[in-house]
Amino acid sequence: MSNYLRKKYNQEFVVEEPSLSAAGLGVEGTWGVDAHPVSSKDTTFRIIKVENRNSFSDQYTAKIWSQRETARLNKIAQQNVANSKWNVKVSVEIYLVEPLADTALPDNPKVEEIIRQDYGPVYNVNLSYFELQNTSYDDIVCDMERIANSITNNSIKMSIITIL
């Protein structure tokens, strides 16, 4: 798995101990392992390999894109927070399915185009609101709509989970 990552991304990775799941008599299992670049322990992602297949699939590109989108949306979320009575934290989790997981690279200049595709990635947005004392829920709903609109204006298909 280390060789696969090194060849695909031209950098070194720390690969943890692999584990086999869902294997049994007559059932192909899936090998899974967590890995991260040597230069960044905060960028842990999953690699999988189905038994009896020669190819691997990983979520490194999805992890990089998730971190970038989280930073971008947190900036949008914080635009009106100075005038608000609450704090909001945004986190984005992108999951790439095949064939994107196999072909997309972190520095792809057309990330937004890839995310917009019908067969593109799963794009989940979590909004966590804190310090809600003396706050109107109507104001919070307006804030959620503002953040959601900034995403959908880019034609990105997503699901939003809100934690109050």
Residue ranges and their predicted role:
Residues 106-164:
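Extracytoplasmic/periplasmic C-terminal soluble domains
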Residues 1-17, 69-82, 144-145:
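Short, non-transmembrane alpha-helical segments in secretory-pathway proteins
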Residues 43-66:
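A short, surface-exposed beta-strand/turn
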Residues 39-41, 53, 98-100, 131-133:
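Residues that cap or initiate secondary-structure elements
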Residues 12-49:
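Exposed beta-strand-loop-beta-strand "reactive/processing" segments of non-cytosolic proteins
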Residues 60, 64, 68, 135-142:
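Alpha-helix boundary/N-cap detector
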Residues 62-126:
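Non-cytosolic head/periplasmic domains of membrane-anchored proteins
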Residues 7, 11-22, 82-99, 155-163:
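Short glycine-rich, low-complexity/disordered patches
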